[in-house]
């Protein structure tokens, strides 16, 4: 099922997972509507929800591997994975820059694995380069290719409350 927890609740739930032998968790944010913008800039706020959650989990459960989601849809007011122009076109290259900033912010907080779930061209190579430039060669990048064709995609969008809205025009 789909669950949302406060930071304290997350720490407790991850502790229960650890006790069951689970050694990796994936974090997805439910961003407050007031923090969502057209460019999704909250995604790379190092004081934001996901970096705070990572740091807290690493303090309390240092052996737990933490995977994070990299995409703009939880942070954008239109629910899209990328920055959208006034003409309704997703701006690939501009979006990739933000995804790199997001991945680096998550790595700085202690993420072990980065999972780009957006659909921007060239983002994996760009994220790898950005992580390496910041000294995070050890942070892995994992693929999401199977999720979109699975029963997990609907609940994922529901959990994030980020179904994309139609472009204007």
Language-model features, listed with the residues they occupy:
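Alpha/beta enzyme core
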Residues: 1-169
